[in-house]
């Protein structure tokens, strides 16, 4: 869900 983090 978050492009700048590991989360999608």
From Swiss-Prot:
Position(s), cross-link Cyclopeptide (Met-Pro): 1-8
Cited function: Cyclic octapeptide that belongs to the MSDIN-like toxin family responsible for a large number of food poisoning cases and deaths. Cycloaminide B is non-toxic to mammals but shows immunosuppressive activity, probably through the inhibition of the action of interleukin-1 and interleukin-2.
Family that this chain belongs to: Belongs to the MSDIN fungal toxin family.
Processing after translation: Processed by the macrocyclase-peptidase enzyme POPB to yield a cyclic octapeptide. POPB first removes 10 residues from the N-terminus. Conformational trapping of the remaining peptide forces the enzyme to release this intermediate rather than proceed to macrocyclization. The enzyme rebinds the remaining peptide in a different conformation and catalyzes macrocyclization of the N-terminal 8 residues.
Protein name: Cycloamanide C
Alphabetical keyword list: Toxin
Keyword Nucleus recorded: no
Molecular function terms from GO: toxin activity
Organism of origin: Amanita phalloides
């Amino acid at each position: 869900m978050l492009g700048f983090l590991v989360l999608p």
